[in-house]
Amino acid sequence: MKLLLSGMLAGYILASSILSMTTGTPRMPAISRETLHLVGYSSKMKIPNVVCINSRYLSSEGGWVKRSVNYMFPIDKPWRGKSSTVEVKWEPYAVLLHMKTSYDVSRDLQTKSQYVVRNYDDNSLVLSDLNEVSSCSLWVTKEYLDKIPETTNRTFYHLCPDPVYTPFDENCYVN
């Protein structure tokens, strides 16, 4: 009987160690080295004449991550692009994502200084306005532009009123 119990215990320990190796804590995309693409938002957040919004990792220092925010104005051909630096900070498991932006980014993209993290995994992120829960944005890595993770997609669709998905435009990747 002791041999059977010790065999079961050994099997449990082995299974637990394998599970813990494969199901760790997800990486927060906003502070990772991945490029993030805005693929959805609440319809009331639509910004006329701004498309192709993405954010690339630049560096980190003192708990803040520097990212470039890139976006296009599709008014004339060729499209005019703009790039600015923002800083983001997120404490592990925290509800809030903090952001420092330039005046231009704040004006062009109507950014806030804090966002509520509604859902995230290694490749996707749903944020909402701290004061206006109905204002949400959905960000994914390039690998997930065509296949948004189900839990993230469900969170975006159910928590964000009148969700809008941004259409893929090849002009975003010409430059």
UniProtKB/Swiss-Prot annotation:
Tissue expr: Expressed in salivary glands.
Subcellular location: Secreted
Gene Ontology cellular component terms for the protein in this record: extracellular region
Glycosylation sites: 153
Keywords annotated in UniProt: Disulfide bond, Glycoprotein, Secreted, Signal
Disulfide bond sites: 52-172, 136-160
Gene3D superfamilies assigned: 2.40.128.20
Extent of the signal sequence: 1-24
Superkingdom as given in the UniProt entry: Eukaryota
Sequence similarity: Belongs to the calycin superfamily. Lipocalin family.
Domain notes: Each monomer contains a pocket that accomodates cholesterol. Cholesterol derivatives (such as epicholesterol, epicholestanol, epicoprostenol, or 7-dehydrocholesterol) could also fit in the pocket with minor rearrangement of the side chain. Since arthropods are unable to synthesize cholesterol de novo, it is likely that a cholesterol ligand would be bloodmeal-derived.
SUBUNIT field: Homodimer; non-disulfide-linked. Each monomer accommodates one molecule of cholesterol in a pocket.
Protein purpose: Salivary tick protein that modulates host immune response. This protein blocks dendritic cell (DC) differentiation from monocytes. In addition, it inhibits up-regulation of costimulatory molecules and pro-inflammatory cytokines in response to stimuli and promotes up-regulation of co-inhibitory molecules and the anti-inflammatory cytokine interleukin-10. It has a pocket to accomodate cholesterol, which may have immune-modulatory roles, either directly or through interactions with the host gut microbiota.
Protein name: Japanin-like-RA2
